[in-house]
Amino acid sequence: MSSSALIAPAAKEEVATLFVGFELSKSTWLIGLYAPELGKSISRHKVDGGDTDAALELIAAARRRLERLGKPVRVVSVYEAGYDGIWLHRRLTAAGIENRVIDAASIPVDRRSRRAKTDRLDLELLIRMLLALERGETRICRVVQVPDPAAEDAKRQHRERTVLVAERTAHGNRITGS
C-alpha cells in the first residue's frame, strides 16, 4: 500500500496530530513523520542510532510547522519492541510524546506473497498501524505494557545471572574439551 493511501483517524476536536514512527537499528534510526494537515506523504529522516537529541529536534521542528496552523499539536509515536528496549519509551514520554511500543510478533504479514523487507516499508507499516490504533482498531496489533523502572530492575538481576551461568558453562566446556 502506498503512503498516499494513508487515512487519518477522525478528528476528536480541533487538534493537529503528528504521527511519528521509529524503525530502530544499532547504527541508524529511520524516523517517519506524518501529519495529515501538512500533506499526504510520510517524510523520512535518518539519524544515528541512539541519538535521541537529534530525533527529538526533528520532531520539534515538525511540531513547530504544525503549530503555525493555529491548532494545539499532539505528537503520537510508535516503535517495535526489541533491541532498544524501554528506555526510548521513557525518553519520549518525558518529552511529552504519547508513545506506543508494539510487539514485533503481532505485526500482520501477508502470507500470500513474499514481501520485500526494507526499513522504508516497515516504517510505513508502523505508521499505518499507529493510525489504525488511533482510530480505535485495537485488534490490529499488540501494544506492549511498559513496566515501571522498579519492575524492570527486578528482571535485570535474573537476566544477568542467566548470562553469567551460560558463560561459566561455556568456560567449563572449553576446559574439558581441550
Task: Go through the PLM ranges and name each one.
Residues 1-178:
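Phosphate- and other anionic-substrate recognition elements at nucleic-acid/protein interfaces
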